[in-house]
Structure formats: structure tokens, C-alpha cells
Amino acid sequence: MTLILGIDPGSRITGYGVVRDTGRGCVYVASGCIRTGAGELPDRLQIVYRGVREVIQTYGPVTMGIEKVFMARNADSALKLGQARGAAIVAGAEEGLEIAEYTATQVKQAVAGTGGANKEQVQMMVMHLLKLTTKPQIDASDALAIAICHAHTRSSLLPHGLGTARSRGGRLRL
């Protein structure tokens, strides 16, 4: 049984979700949001970095899935999102986690069965798959969806001898 961390990065709110992959599905462990509040970007990135490390040290996942940067209409927002991703990736790499990246479409496809699912549909499927009785915050729900996607991807690759190689920086390339 593998503990998996999912990260939905953001420069203001970073969602996290931890699931246990039992081989027959995922079991909910924890989820929440790292809120950076107002402040200068370097300070907010440090909060993301420290928050992700704290989650890793608290729950002990061995692998992490994180959402890839999407093309945003606002270049400044995309850059800030990329920097928040970087802070989370460095935190995971420093803790020795294997790290895989997924597009939003891949996550939606894995969890809801369609890459065009909206946030509410993904949230409802996360609740169903993890047998949750209350709705997680939307950023935490997205992070749980990323963790579920990572569990599904790992389980489909590992029997074929794939998904275990590590490249520079401990990042798992799929």
C-alpha cells in the first residue's frame, strides 16, 4: 500500500490530498489547503514550499503527482503558477519523493471519465471514489483527484516495468 500526495499548485492557495493506494482503489488519508495570504511573491512561495514539506513529513507519502501548468490568458498568472509549482516540486524532491506531472485533462479523464469534466463533476467523483461524506474544498478536491490519477497511472505502468525509473532531481517521467 503506497501513500500518494497530490498537489494542485497555486500562488495564493495550494491544495493537497493524500491517499493510500491499496491496489484495489484509493483510500482517503488527508486533504487541505496551504493558504499564502497577501504578501510578496517570494514570501508566498516560501509558504508553499514549507507547507508542502510539512504535509510530506506529517503523512509520509513516497510519491507525488502535481498538475502541469496550463496556458493562461494572463501571462503573469501563468508565471506565478509555475513558480508555485516549482516550490512544491523542490519540496517533494528534497524529501526524496518520485514526482509525476499531469495535465488537467489527464486528471479529469482518470477521475471523471472525460477530459472535459468541470470542477464540480470532478469533486463529486472524488467524493464517490474516496467514499467521502462531505465535500472537500475545491483546491483540496483537485489535489485528491491528482493523487487518484497518479495512483491509476502508477498501477497501469508498474506491471510493465515502467514508472520506476528516476531521472535527474528524482522526477518520475511518464
From Swiss-Prot:
State a single Pfam family of this protein. RuvC
Q: What are the record keywords, sorted? A: Cytoplasm, DNA damage, DNA recombination, DNA repair, DNA-binding, Endonuclease, Hydrolase, Magnesium, Metal-binding, Nuclease
Quote the subcellular location field of this record. Cytoplasm
Q: Which residues form the active site?
A: D8, E67, D139
What stretch or stretches form a coiled coil here?
none
Query: Where is it found, in Gene Ontology cellular component terms?
Result: cytoplasm; Holliday junction resolvase complex
Residues binding Mg(2+) 1, per UniProt: D8, D139
Reactions catalysed, as given in the entry: Endonucleolytic cleavage at a junction such as a reciprocal single-stranded crossover between two homologous DNA duplexes (Holliday junction)
Q: How, per the record, is the cofactor bound? A: Binds 2 Mg(2+) ion per subunit.
Its main subcellular localisation, reduced to a broad class, is cytoplasm
Report the EC number(s), separated by commas if there are several.
3.1.21.10
The record's Gene Ontology biological-process terms are:
DNA recombination; DNA repair
Cofactors (names): Mg(2+)
Annotated NCBIfam families: ruvC (TIGR00228)
Q: What does this protein do?
A: The RuvA-RuvB-RuvC complex processes Holliday junction (HJ) DNA during genetic recombination and DNA repair. Endonuclease that resolves HJ intermediates. Cleaves cruciform DNA by making single-stranded nicks across the HJ at symmetrical positions within the homologous arms, yielding a 5'-phosphate and a 3'-hydroxyl group; requires a central core of homology in the junction. The consensus cleavage sequence is 5'-(A/T)TT(C/G)-3'. Cleavage occurs on the 3'-side of the TT dinucleotide at the point of strand exchange.
The subunit structure is: Homodimer which binds Holliday junction (HJ) DNA. The HJ becomes 2-fold symmetrical on binding to RuvC with unstacked arms; it has a different conformation from HJ DNA in complex with RuvA. In the full resolvosome a probable DNA-RuvA(4)-RuvB(12)-RuvC(2) complex forms which resolves the HJ.
Q: What is this protein called?
A: Crossover junction endodeoxyribonuclease RuvC
Species name: Pseudomonas fluorescens (strain ATCC BAA-477 / NRRL B-23932 / Pf-5)
Q: What is the lineage of its organism?
A: Bacteria, Pseudomonadati, Pseudomonadota, Gammaproteobacteria, Pseudomonadales
